[in-house]
From Swiss-Prot:
Compositional bias per record (Low complexity), positions renumbered to this chain: 1230-1241
Keyword Lyase: no
GO CC term, one of those recorded: mediator complex
Keywords, in A-Z order: Nucleus, Transcription, Transcription regulation
Superkingdom of origin: Eukaryota
SUBUNIT field: Component of the Mediator complex.
Function: Component of the Mediator complex, a coactivator involved in the regulated transcription of nearly all RNA polymerase II-dependent genes. Mediator functions as a bridge to convey information from gene-specific regulatory proteins to the basal RNA polymerase II transcription machinery. The Mediator complex, having a compact conformation in its free form, is recruited to promoters by direct interactions with regulatory proteins and serves for the assembly of a functional preinitiation complex with RNA polymerase II and the general transcription factors.
Designated name of the protein: Mediator of RNA polymerase II transcription subunit 23
Compartment(s) of residence: Nucleus
Chain segments carrying region Disordered: 40-67, 1230-1270
Organism: Arabidopsis thaliana (Mouse-ear cress)
Amino acid sequence: MDQSQRTVAATPSSSRSYQFHPARAAIIDLFNLYLGRGSRQKPDESLRDPPNKSQKRVHAPNRDLPPRNEQFLLDFELLQSQFNDPEQLRTITESVLISLVVQCSNHAPRAEFLLFALRTLCRISYINWDTFLPSLLSSVSAAEASLSQGVQAAAATAGSSATSSQSVVPVSVNPTSLLPSAHGIGSPSASEVKSVENGQQIARAGQIVRENAMRNSQRIRAAAVNSLRQLSCKIILIGVESSLKPVTHAEIFQYMMNWLVNWDRRDLGTEDSVGKSWRSEKTLAEWLRSCLDVIWLLVEEGESRIPFYELLRSGLQFIENIPDDEALFTLIMEIHRRRDAMAMHMLMLDQHLHCPSFGTHRIVSQITANVPPEAVPHLRHSPITYPSVLGEPLYGEDLAMSIPKGSLDWERAVRCIRHAIRTTPSPDWWKRVLVVAPCYRPSTQAGPIPGAVFTSDMICEAIIDRIVELLKLTNSGNDCFGIDLVSVTFPPLYADANCWQEWLVFSDIFFFLIKSGCTDFVDFIDKLVLRLNGVDNHILRTNHVTWLLAQIIRVELVMTALNSDAKKVETTRKILSFHREDRNSDPNNPQSVLLDFVSSCQNLRIWSLSTTTRAYLNNEQLLKGKQIDEWWRSKGERMMDYMNMDDRSIGMFWVVSYTMAQPACETVINWLSSAGMAELPGLQPNDRVMMTQEVTPLPMSLLSGFSMNLCLKLALQMEEALFVSQVVPSIAMVETYTRLLLISPHSMFRSHFSQLAQRNASLLSKPGVTLLVLEILNYRLLPLYRYQGKSKTLMYDVTKIISALKGKRGDHRIFRLAENLCMNLILSLRDFFSVKREGKGPTEFTETLNRITIMTLAITIKTRGIADPDHMVYLQTMLEQILATSQHTWSEKTMRHFPSLLRETLKGRVDKRGLSIQAWQQAETTVINQCTQLLSPSAEPAYVSTYLSHSFPQHRQYLCAGACLLMQGHAENINSTNLARVLREVSPEEVTANIYTLVDVLLHHVHVDLQQGQSLEAVLDKAGANLAFFFWTHEMLPLDIFLLALIDRDDDPHALIIAMSLLKTPDLLLRIKNYCQNRGSPEHWLVTQVFKRNELQKALGNHLSWKDRYPTFFDDIAARLLPVIPLVLYRLIENNAMEQADNLLLAHSHFLAYHPLRFTFVRDILAYFYGHLPGKLVLRMLKVLDLSKIPFSESFPQYISPTGAPVCPPLDYFASLLLNLVNNVIPPLSSSSNCSSRSGSMADILNSSARPPHGKTPGTSQPGPANASEGQKAFYQIQDPGTYTQLVLETAVIEILSLPVSAAQIVSSLVQIIVNIQSTLIQSGNGFHGAANGVGQGSVLPTSPSGGSTDSMSASRSTCLIPGINTASFVSRSGYTCQQLSCLLIQACGLLLAQLPPDFHVQLYLEAARVTRETWWLKDGKRSQGELDSAVGYALMDPTWAAQDNTSTAIGNIVALLHAFFSNLPQEWLDGTNAIITNLRPVTSVAMLRVVFRIMGPLLPRLASTHTLFNKTLMLLLSALVDVFGKTAQTTAPVEASQIADLIDFLHHIIHYEGQGGAVQTSSKPRPDILALIGRAAETLRPDVQHLLAHLKTNPNSSIYAAAHQQNTAKTNTS
């Protein structure tokens, strides 16, 4: 043996007990005899042999030649007969063989004999390969580790020897020499120089020796590893020919892959230049090729010992240093080819265009996390994901940071952020996606953020893009998008053409982003300077950037950068460089004044920050600050009348807000209290309360220009006056405070309950503070909280108040206001929510709130679906929590419209109404006796206390019912004073119980009276008189709760009649009229008059105002009905009372204008009852909206006209609707502004040809000023739905839902546009001729040779244009090229369809199947399989890429539409997607099969978190596979199974993805039930296809995955 073998110790046996077994010595002797080794030679004996070959020849002992190999079997059988335990002998033999393989691998003759011996023993079935091969590979790994340690030791020895030789270099200084030195003082002698040179030479020699030793060690190890691995591979090739278990195959595969992936790993710690020397040697190729032979044998399709998919997920293709080996390169290329083919099925068409549109307020994350709903508000949100090479959606900050700038993924991420900055989605969205810039993170948070998908660099780039975009708009010389934005917000006198509103909206979010620390401020300034001095050096002409930076100059991070950062001087100089002299034609315009002085404000602030930067300030601007002081002394210090300020004064006051925020704040507060104070009237002297007199609140036009610093100071001081001061604030103060919060929703928002609790925990214990907070929230800030995503949190806070008060006697006002607010909050939620913050136990809601929660769930599920799979799991628990404290049963008419998820749960509940009446009848006698004593006209007032202290609660709940019976329509029959006192002094919970029992008893006695022969009119008149006593005469009960209780008994034929009569009562109508007059405009933020405070008793009635003296601000009995009327409308429609519903809307349409969320309310009713509403009622509902402010299509009214027969609008109408979404909802393709040409990487990819110079102007459904886009509106202008993007999308939804034609007609029109849009747009220059002869015929196959299409195929193709579309204006109104526009219209259509109810989805699936089936080349039986495969490959190309060559196809467009649709669907609605496969079956060709997989494949990763739906979809895909490759399949031409290898790989991959619940890892395994499902389906497949799925079964004897499950189960049981 050579040196390498002598360094290897003998491998220990698998069991130490066999080491001393007598058979072991005999077996070793036998093998040593045939190996030509000395008898019983110890494994390490060879270490003493000298390495010199000549010495070995001289000293070699005389040995006999070994016996012939043919004799071995006889000798072995003879030895075998000497021992009784054959199994033990086999184990020992295997152990010895493994040891000999390790020792003799570098000795070719001995290695050959070992191979011979193994073959011989294999022929007699003596080797158990399933134990032998894993043990062999384990021993090889141990031997390689030992080799590495030995080589490291040798290298260390060589290094130490070289060091020692260097340390003993002699230096001859010869101190005893008598000869004088020949050199001057300090000069070395010749001998010294020579000795130093000798020392350096010796050191270099030592280094060379060390390097040579290292190289020799490397070569020795390489040779040893090569021989050992090569011999092992040869043995494995022998073993694999036997029938091995799947576990053995898997283990062999893992070892082989580990060897290949780590082929160049160096364990010696040497430098790379030293370690490379052995890689290119012949030894590498030998073992590597043997290893490849094993792998090819394992993945051989004929045997399929290991599925080829294991190679795809092995990571072999990612090795950094691919050796120069053709065989390995061939394998890697094959892996890449099959991986790409498989990954395609994971990716949606045009996936790089899929990006959140923010068209809904729902946050839909692209990742799923198994968390309870109560934890959702704290989750990180991943709005996009990055596809891996295997097509899996990935996320994480470490991944995002690896995205190269300028790549498609980078552009997609920045596109998303740009669109968010433009459309200002919920701050809650921003908080969940932002990452703190690394420079601002504490050391404890140094690691990457797992759920993040954006980096600070991406956010910085998007911010700068938006600044550049706004600068270009400002410089355009015309107002934004062709209309005057400012006039929308301000009076005409403040209008300018510089897109001031756009800047205001952006400054709010800019402040929010900078304060969040999501981008490095110093780096941001550097990049902004480079951008404005580089490509865009001509656009900075105004002081808008200086103004923008002045807004944030007091942010802590900014002050740190300007005061203590190392680059503070440079940063300051760059900030000052943005100053430009103002050249506005109107110097008195408020914005012009501000921009003219803002540089001075900035210089003054920087001067006060740091002395080191003062030298760089502009003295002229500093001196200009004196003008500000002079103006302030002359005008500002005295009381200012903010309602009569001229333009210049407004501008100067804005300037003052930047330089003297505190004085400016004080003047505003002084103005709001300038009318003085007065005593609250009607109080006793000892109850004296002071109240601030009313003035006009500050107008929005003035507030909008305040600096953010002043706004924050004002908010704090106002909160002090509102919630801490003992003086009752004025309505003007409250209104101004809410306007501050509405004008800057990102920067100014605060959660009121949390903030007040932090400021002073005792504040909320004061009734006045609690009432004021509840009123502000209920009547002013409800939409703001929804926009912020804080409605659920607020609901939990309010629920705490309700829970604490519902059993407390007397606190009715706070309780009913809190209940009404909670009612509004629940009805405003359009996403799933947990009914308890903790998530466990029954709800703390009242019975009323429980019922409203069920209704809200029904509306949400039916109109928007459940977005998250975890919410679907939690739904049942939530229902149990609600129903645990609610006894209500919903009528059949109501549940008929409920979604099936709710209906199945609720339909089994027992109706306890009969039991309720029985309980009343049992208690009736006692109740009437008590009521007679309490309520007789002559009853003593003192009896009230006796009644309250001695009556039982089960009897008190019938008090109002008993009073009603005693009254008999005559109010004088009862003592109203005593009744009112009892109802005030019992708890709110008991009043609610009285209301519900009153409804039941009232309806019961209506039936009794009718049975006794009384007329219906007389009975209802009596009931009306009784109710008038409670609600109008004495105001004893809350009307809103009674109405809700009444309509919930809608299965009683008289309940809705009584409810409608109450809503039409003159008393109520008068109250509503007075409320509207006192309230003024529904847009309260525009009111510039002095608010009039309503008297407490007039506003709330006797019951709620009782002993309370704290005045109201906005609260009113009429306002409490706003959430109730829509629910009454629901009940009327459910009961088919359409005429009454129309009358209700007619009577209260003006009042409903005050509904805080009326746009959402109209949209949801149209969606909830789609298909059941008559056209007249639809029109009435639309009139509830402020039509002048809704961007409806100009032609929309003519298609919903009640006159004439319903007509489906032309295609031009639908195309324009989609164009409007492209222009206002779909994220733009580049960072360039709406007024400039499109550019950027993604846009370039969409179209490489030259684009026209015209810019993207906001599309309108029809030309005309009435529909012109109004640009970016402030939040307060569109509080419902919240953003302009949402408004445009939801308006399109309302239009579609209002059309008087079927869903099938609408979907057919949309699909017809989409499948032919590209050919229509491109060929529009040639005119339009003819009509569409079927949607599927309009596609064109590519004619390129690589497309595989032939002349005969192209000869019969036809193009189909869409008739009726004015494409000339269509394209010009978009600002995109034809190719770009066609792709974006597909995205817009998918988004729109995903917002519509499931009725439309069913039609879409039918249309998609029809288009696919009608494709002529899929039906052409004359085409070869190769032609069809090529055709389907090109047909399923991304429309983005197909658009470049004008090769868009019907199938490609329809699949892209489905994928855009899928990406916007909530999780629950994905359940219906399986209808596509059902509609396409039976699948009759491989081409059609590929279409099916291409449609549904990308959906499966989203379904991985919904196991049941995943199984269902997978089963249908397998059924389609059986259609083509089943044993009884009737296909036109036989197809080999190898042609669907990519589909087989995809099936392997997706079940691993589902088993892992995410990206596939090395430990990922499929679920056993999935294996069982595929196994059952495989039984019906052809044998050759079955063979490809052999491992996707539950049989551990044939499946490596089933065997792995069995192993894990065994380990678990053992442990």
